[in-house]
Amino acid sequence: MASPNPAQSTTILFRRLTWQSAVTISIRLADGEPGAGNACDRYYIKAPRYSYLPLFIPEIRENLVELALDDAQLEQIDEKNWWFEEEVSEEDKQRFVRQGACRWHWPIDLVDIHSFISRPQPLPSSIELSSTPRVISLLLHLSNPPQDRLLMPNSIEVCKSQWLNQVKEADFVRWRNTNRVTNLRRVDLEAGWDGIVNNDFDLYAQMVNKIVPLPLLTSSNSTQPSRPSSADPSGPPRAPDSSYATRAIPFKIYLPDNAPVIQEIVPPISESGKPTTLLAVLQVHLPLLFPISSENPYELAFPIAQGILIPQEAEVAWIASCLCGVDGWVRVGVCLSAA
Protein backbone atom coordinates (compact mmCIF):
# COMPACT_ATOMS: atom_id res chain seq x y z
CA MET A 1 0.00 0.00 0.00
CA ALA A 2 1.36 3.40 -0.98
CA SER A 3 2.17 5.73 1.90
CA PRO A 4 -0.02 8.83 2.11
CA ASN A 5 1.34 12.02 0.58
CA PRO A 6 2.16 14.39 3.49
CA ALA A 7 1.38 17.46 1.37
CA GLN A 8 -1.99 16.01 0.41
CA SER A 9 -2.86 15.12 4.01
CA THR A 10 -1.92 18.59 5.25
CA THR A 11 -3.80 20.29 2.43
CA ILE A 12 -6.95 18.28 3.11
CA LEU A 13 -6.68 19.25 6.79
CA PHE A 14 -6.52 22.97 5.97
CA ARG A 15 -9.32 22.63 3.42
CA ARG A 16 -11.50 20.98 6.04
CA LEU A 17 -10.72 23.72 8.58
CA THR A 18 -11.61 26.34 5.96
CA TRP A 19 -14.82 24.43 5.23
CA GLN A 20 -15.78 24.49 8.92
CA SER A 21 -15.42 28.28 9.20
CA ALA A 22 -18.77 30.00 9.65
CA VAL A 23 -20.32 33.44 10.02
CA THR A 24 -23.07 34.43 12.44
CA ILE A 25 -25.79 36.36 10.63
CA SER A 26 -28.65 38.30 12.21
CA ILE A 27 -31.61 38.66 9.85
CA ARG A 28 -34.31 41.23 10.56
CA LEU A 29 -37.38 42.15 8.56
CA ALA A 30 -36.77 45.57 7.06
CA ASP A 31 -38.79 48.50 8.38
CA GLY A 32 -42.03 48.89 6.48
CA GLU A 33 -42.31 45.20 5.61
CA PRO A 34 -45.25 43.15 6.93
CA GLY A 35 -44.42 41.77 10.37
CA ALA A 36 -41.56 44.19 11.01
CA GLY A 37 -41.28 45.41 14.59
CA ASN A 38 -43.04 42.53 16.31
CA ALA A 39 -41.45 40.05 18.71
CA CYS A 40 -40.62 37.56 15.95
CA ASP A 41 -38.97 39.81 13.38
CA ARG A 42 -35.36 38.65 13.87
CA TYR A 43 -33.62 35.32 13.23
CA TYR A 44 -30.02 34.15 13.63
CA ILE A 45 -28.19 31.63 11.50
CA LYS A 46 -24.70 30.15 11.61
CA ALA A 47 -23.80 30.21 7.92
CA PRO A 48 -20.79 28.37 6.51
CA ARG A 49 -18.51 30.75 4.63
CA TYR A 50 -18.67 28.58 1.52
CA SER A 51 -22.47 28.69 1.31
CA TYR A 52 -24.84 31.07 -0.50
CA LEU A 53 -27.85 33.09 0.67
CA PRO A 54 -30.39 31.38 -1.65
CA LEU A 55 -29.74 28.10 0.17
CA PHE A 56 -31.08 29.62 3.42
CA ILE A 57 -34.36 30.99 2.07
CA PRO A 58 -36.46 27.91 3.05
CA GLU A 59 -35.05 28.02 6.61
CA ILE A 60 -35.60 31.78 6.89
CA ARG A 61 -39.16 31.47 5.60
CA GLU A 62 -40.02 28.75 8.12
CA ASN A 63 -38.34 30.28 11.17
CA LEU A 64 -38.82 33.99 10.56
CA VAL A 65 -41.29 35.01 7.88
CA GLU A 66 -44.02 32.47 8.68
CA LEU A 67 -43.85 33.43 12.36
CA ALA A 68 -43.87 37.19 11.79
CA LEU A 69 -46.62 37.35 9.14
CA ASP A 70 -50.22 36.22 9.32
CA ASP A 71 -51.78 33.94 6.69
CA ALA A 72 -53.22 36.79 4.66
CA GLN A 73 -49.85 38.53 4.51
CA LEU A 74 -48.08 35.30 3.56
CA GLU A 75 -50.37 34.91 0.58
CA GLN A 76 -49.31 38.32 -0.71
CA ILE A 77 -45.55 37.72 -0.74
CA ASP A 78 -43.41 35.93 -3.31
CA GLU A 79 -39.96 34.55 -2.47
CA LYS A 80 -38.76 35.63 -5.91
CA ASN A 81 -38.99 39.23 -4.70
CA TRP A 82 -36.97 38.76 -1.51
CA TRP A 83 -33.57 40.39 -1.12
CA PHE A 84 -31.05 41.19 1.58
CA GLU A 85 -28.96 44.21 2.40
CA GLU A 86 -26.57 44.93 5.24
CA GLU A 87 -28.06 46.95 8.09
CA VAL A 88 -26.18 50.19 8.61
CA SER A 89 -26.03 52.03 11.93
CA GLU A 90 -26.06 55.82 12.15
CA GLU A 91 -22.37 55.78 13.07
CA ASP A 92 -21.48 53.62 10.07
CA LYS A 93 -23.29 55.96 7.69
CA GLN A 94 -20.44 58.42 8.24
CA ARG A 95 -17.87 55.87 7.06
CA PHE A 96 -17.28 54.09 3.77
CA VAL A 97 -20.06 53.15 1.39
CA ARG A 98 -21.53 49.82 2.55
CA GLN A 99 -22.15 46.84 0.31
CA GLY A 100 -25.89 47.52 0.09
CA ALA A 101 -27.90 44.74 -1.52
CA CYS A 102 -26.18 41.35 -1.19
CA ARG A 103 -25.80 39.64 -4.52
CA TRP A 104 -27.21 36.14 -4.68
CA HIS A 105 -24.15 34.57 -6.28
CA TRP A 106 -21.78 35.89 -3.59
CA PRO A 107 -20.53 33.27 -1.13
CA ILE A 108 -21.19 34.14 2.50
CA ASP A 109 -17.46 34.75 2.93
CA LEU A 110 -17.59 37.58 0.39
CA VAL A 111 -20.57 39.15 2.17
CA ASP A 112 -18.48 39.05 5.35
CA ILE A 113 -15.41 40.52 3.61
CA HIS A 114 -17.41 43.52 2.39
CA SER A 115 -18.87 44.00 5.86
CA PHE A 116 -15.54 43.79 7.68
CA ILE A 117 -13.53 46.10 5.41
CA SER A 118 -16.27 48.75 5.29
CA ARG A 119 -14.70 50.52 8.28
CA PRO A 120 -11.09 50.82 9.53
CA GLN A 121 -10.21 48.11 12.03
CA PRO A 122 -7.36 47.67 14.52
CA LEU A 123 -4.71 45.25 13.34
CA PRO A 124 -5.49 41.89 14.94
CA SER A 125 -2.89 40.73 17.42
CA SER A 126 -3.26 37.16 16.20
CA ILE A 127 -4.87 35.30 13.32
CA GLU A 128 -8.24 35.89 14.97
CA LEU A 129 -9.90 39.03 13.60
CA SER A 130 -11.71 39.64 16.86
CA SER A 131 -11.78 38.23 20.38
CA THR A 132 -15.58 38.36 20.26
CA PRO A 133 -17.63 36.68 17.53
CA ARG A 134 -18.68 39.07 14.78
CA VAL A 135 -22.29 39.23 13.69
CA ILE A 136 -23.38 40.45 10.26
CA SER A 137 -26.72 42.23 10.46
CA LEU A 138 -28.84 41.81 7.34
CA LEU A 139 -32.22 43.30 6.51
CA LEU A 140 -34.71 41.09 4.68
CA HIS A 141 -36.88 42.91 2.16
CA LEU A 142 -39.95 41.08 0.84
CA SER A 143 -40.58 43.19 -2.26
CA ASN A 144 -39.13 45.62 -4.82
CA PRO A 145 -35.76 43.92 -5.45
CA PRO A 146 -33.12 46.21 -7.06
CA GLN A 147 -32.48 44.12 -10.16
CA ASP A 148 -29.66 46.36 -11.33
CA ARG A 149 -27.78 45.48 -8.14
CA LEU A 150 -28.76 41.85 -7.66
CA LEU A 151 -28.12 40.99 -11.33
CA MET A 152 -29.89 37.64 -11.09
CA PRO A 153 -32.82 35.93 -9.34
CA ASN A 154 -32.51 34.06 -6.04
CA SER A 155 -33.10 30.67 -7.65
CA ILE A 156 -30.86 27.87 -6.35
CA GLU A 157 -30.40 26.61 -9.91
CA VAL A 158 -29.15 30.02 -11.03
CA CYS A 159 -26.81 30.09 -8.03
CA LYS A 160 -25.48 26.65 -8.96
CA SER A 161 -24.92 27.78 -12.55
CA GLN A 162 -22.97 30.83 -11.38
CA TRP A 163 -20.88 28.68 -9.03
CA LEU A 164 -19.99 26.33 -11.88
CA ASN A 165 -19.07 29.27 -14.11
CA GLN A 166 -16.68 30.49 -11.42
CA VAL A 167 -15.18 27.00 -11.06
CA LYS A 168 -14.48 26.92 -14.80
CA GLU A 169 -13.09 30.46 -14.81
CA ALA A 170 -10.71 29.59 -11.97
CA ASP A 171 -9.55 26.52 -13.89
CA PHE A 172 -8.90 28.66 -16.96
CA VAL A 173 -6.84 31.14 -14.93
CA ARG A 174 -4.67 28.28 -13.66
CA TRP A 175 -4.05 26.41 -16.90
CA ARG A 176 -5.35 28.53 -19.81
CA ASN A 177 -8.00 25.86 -20.38
CA THR A 178 -10.86 24.21 -18.51
CA ASN A 179 -9.91 20.61 -19.26
CA ARG A 180 -9.71 19.55 -15.63
CA VAL A 181 -13.31 20.63 -15.04
CA THR A 182 -14.81 19.52 -18.36
CA ASN A 183 -13.09 16.13 -18.07
CA LEU A 184 -14.64 15.44 -14.67
CA ARG A 185 -17.18 12.66 -14.47
CA ARG A 186 -20.65 14.10 -14.01
CA VAL A 187 -20.99 12.32 -10.66
CA ASP A 188 -17.86 14.08 -9.36
CA LEU A 189 -19.01 17.48 -10.61
CA GLU A 190 -22.44 17.06 -9.05
CA ALA A 191 -20.77 15.92 -5.82
CA GLY A 192 -19.13 19.34 -5.54
CA TRP A 193 -22.44 21.20 -5.50
CA ASP A 194 -24.24 18.53 -3.47
CA GLY A 195 -21.52 18.82 -0.83
CA ILE A 196 -22.16 22.57 -0.59
CA VAL A 197 -25.93 22.12 -0.31
CA ASN A 198 -25.73 19.26 2.20
CA ASN A 199 -22.79 20.59 4.25
CA ASP A 200 -20.78 17.47 3.39
CA PHE A 201 -17.04 18.12 3.05
CA ASP A 202 -16.19 14.58 1.94
CA LEU A 203 -18.72 14.84 -0.88
CA TYR A 204 -17.35 18.22 -1.94
CA ALA A 205 -13.77 16.90 -1.74
CA GLN A 206 -14.71 14.28 -4.32
CA MET A 207 -14.63 17.15 -6.83
CA VAL A 208 -12.14 19.65 -5.44
CA ASN A 209 -9.34 17.12 -4.98
CA LYS A 210 -9.44 16.49 -8.73
CA ILE A 211 -9.27 20.09 -9.92
CA VAL A 212 -7.53 22.25 -7.28
CA PRO A 213 -3.80 21.42 -7.27
CA LEU A 214 -1.71 20.65 -4.21
CA PRO A 215 0.98 23.03 -2.89
CA LEU A 216 3.86 20.84 -4.06
CA LEU A 217 7.06 22.89 -4.31
CA THR A 218 9.84 20.89 -5.99
CA SER A 219 12.95 21.69 -7.97
CA SER A 220 11.02 20.98 -11.16
CA ASN A 221 8.41 23.68 -10.50
CA SER A 222 8.34 26.46 -13.06
CA THR A 223 5.96 29.11 -14.22
CA GLN A 224 4.91 26.90 -17.13
CA PRO A 225 1.77 24.89 -16.40
CA SER A 226 1.84 21.14 -16.70
CA ARG A 227 -0.11 19.39 -19.42
CA PRO A 228 -3.85 19.03 -18.81
CA SER A 229 -5.04 15.75 -17.42
CA SER A 230 -6.01 13.10 -19.89
CA ALA A 231 -9.64 12.30 -20.48
CA ASP A 232 -8.70 8.65 -20.96
CA PRO A 233 -9.30 6.85 -17.64
CA SER A 234 -7.24 3.89 -18.84
CA GLY A 235 -4.15 6.03 -19.39
CA PRO A 236 -1.12 5.90 -17.10
CA PRO A 237 -1.39 7.59 -13.71
CA ARG A 238 -0.26 11.20 -13.71
CA ALA A 239 1.72 12.98 -11.02
CA PRO A 240 -0.40 15.36 -8.92
CA ASP A 241 -0.71 18.91 -10.20
CA SER A 242 1.18 21.57 -8.27
CA SER A 243 -0.24 25.00 -7.53
CA TYR A 244 3.33 26.28 -7.93
CA ALA A 245 3.32 25.10 -11.57
CA THR A 246 0.14 26.85 -12.65
CA ARG A 247 0.09 29.74 -15.11
CA ALA A 248 -1.53 32.00 -12.52
CA ILE A 249 -3.48 31.98 -9.27
CA PRO A 250 -7.27 32.65 -9.33
CA PHE A 251 -6.98 35.73 -7.14
CA LYS A 252 -9.23 38.72 -6.38
CA ILE A 253 -8.60 41.67 -4.08
CA TYR A 254 -11.54 43.55 -2.55
CA LEU A 255 -11.23 47.13 -1.31
CA PRO A 256 -13.38 49.38 0.92
CA ASP A 257 -15.88 51.93 -0.34
CA ASN A 258 -17.12 49.63 -3.12
CA ALA A 259 -13.94 50.25 -5.10
CA PRO A 260 -13.44 48.09 -8.23
CA VAL A 261 -12.22 44.56 -7.61
CA ILE A 262 -8.57 43.97 -8.47
CA GLN A 263 -8.12 40.86 -10.61
CA GLU A 264 -4.70 40.65 -12.22
CA ILE A 265 -2.36 37.89 -13.34
CA VAL A 266 -0.71 36.57 -10.18
CA PRO A 267 2.02 34.01 -10.99
CA PRO A 268 2.85 31.48 -8.25
CA ILE A 269 6.59 31.89 -8.91
CA SER A 270 8.21 35.31 -9.19
CA GLU A 271 10.69 36.33 -11.88
CA SER A 272 13.47 35.66 -9.38
CA GLY A 273 12.39 32.02 -9.18
CA LYS A 274 11.06 32.31 -5.63
CA PRO A 275 7.46 31.63 -4.57
CA THR A 276 5.25 34.72 -4.79
CA THR A 277 4.11 35.91 -1.37
CA LEU A 278 0.89 37.70 -0.55
CA LEU A 279 2.82 40.78 0.55
CA ALA A 280 4.62 40.92 -2.80
CA VAL A 281 1.26 40.90 -4.62
CA LEU A 282 -0.11 43.68 -2.41
CA GLN A 283 3.03 45.78 -2.85
CA VAL A 284 2.73 45.52 -6.63
CA HIS A 285 -0.97 46.36 -6.91
CA LEU A 286 -1.46 48.59 -3.84
CA PRO A 287 1.93 50.26 -3.29
CA LEU A 288 0.51 53.21 -1.35
CA LEU A 289 -1.12 50.94 1.23
CA PHE A 290 1.74 48.43 1.35
CA PRO A 291 4.94 50.42 0.71
CA ILE A 292 8.08 48.38 0.13
CA SER A 293 10.11 50.69 2.36
CA SER A 294 7.87 50.23 5.39
CA GLU A 295 9.28 48.33 8.37
CA ASN A 296 5.73 47.33 9.28
CA PRO A 297 4.03 46.36 6.00
CA TYR A 298 0.61 46.12 7.69
CA GLU A 299 0.81 49.57 9.29
CA LEU A 300 -1.70 51.22 6.91
CA ALA A 301 -3.81 48.23 5.89
CA PHE A 302 -3.93 44.47 6.28
CA PRO A 303 -5.34 41.52 4.29
CA ILE A 304 -7.96 39.02 5.38
CA ALA A 305 -9.18 35.80 3.79
CA GLN A 306 -11.66 33.23 5.10
CA GLY A 307 -12.12 35.33 8.24
CA ILE A 308 -8.46 35.41 9.31
CA LEU A 309 -5.47 37.73 9.03
CA ILE A 310 -3.07 36.41 6.39
CA PRO A 311 0.65 36.57 7.30
CA GLN A 312 2.79 38.63 4.94
CA GLU A 313 5.07 35.68 4.14
CA ALA A 314 2.19 33.40 3.08
CA GLU A 315 2.77 32.09 -0.44
CA VAL A 316 -0.12 32.65 -2.84
CA ALA A 317 0.21 29.13 -4.27
CA TRP A 318 -0.29 27.68 -0.80
CA ILE A 319 -3.22 30.01 -0.12
CA ALA A 320 -4.81 28.96 -3.43
CA SER A 321 -4.59 25.29 -2.44
CA CYS A 322 -5.69 25.55 1.17
CA LEU A 323 -7.79 28.71 1.63
CA CYS A 324 -9.62 29.17 -1.67
CA GLY A 325 -13.40 29.35 -1.86
CA VAL A 326 -15.51 26.42 -3.03
CA ASP A 327 -15.35 27.83 -6.56
CA GLY A 328 -11.54 27.79 -6.52
CA TRP A 329 -11.03 31.55 -6.13
CA VAL A 330 -8.85 33.22 -3.54
CA ARG A 331 -10.68 36.28 -2.20
CA VAL A 332 -8.62 38.72 -0.16
CA GLY A 333 -10.17 41.73 1.53
CA VAL A 334 -7.98 44.74 2.29
CA CYS A 335 -8.98 46.55 5.48
CA LEU A 336 -7.58 49.94 6.46
CA SER A 337 -5.88 49.96 9.85
CA ALA A 338 -7.57 52.07 12.52
CA ALA A 339 -5.40 54.81 13.97
Curated annotation (Swiss-Prot):
Bias kind Low complexity: ranges: 219-230
Cross-linked sites for Glycyl lysine isopeptide (Lys-Gly) (interchain with G-Cter in ATG12): K168
Superkingdom as given in the UniProt entry: Eukaryota
Spans annotated as Disordered: 219-241
Ubl conjugation listed as a keyword: yes
Subcellular locations according to the entry: Preautophagosomal structure membrane
Reported modifications of this chain: Conjugated to ATG12; which is essential for autophagy.
Record's GO cellular component terms: Atg12-Atg5-Atg16 complex; autophagosome; phagophore; phagophore assembly site membrane
InterPro entries found in the cross-reference section: Atg5, ATG5_HBR, Atg5_HR, ATG5_UblA, Atg5_UblA_dom_sf, ATG5_UblB
GO biological process annotation, one example: autophagosome assembly
KW Hydrolase (keyword) present: no
Functional description taken from the UniProt entry: Involved in cytoplasm to vacuole transport (Cvt) and autophagic vesicle formation. Autophagy is essential for maintenance of amino acid levels and protein synthesis under nitrogen starvation. Required for selective autophagic degradation of the nucleus (nucleophagy). Also required for mitophagy, which eliminates defective or superfluous mitochondria in order to fulfill cellular energy requirements and prevent excess ROS production.
Complex and partners: Conjugated with ATG12.
Family: Belongs to the ATG5 family.
Name of protein: Autophagy protein 5
Organism: Cryptococcus neoformans var. neoformans serotype D (strain JEC21 / ATCC MYA-565)
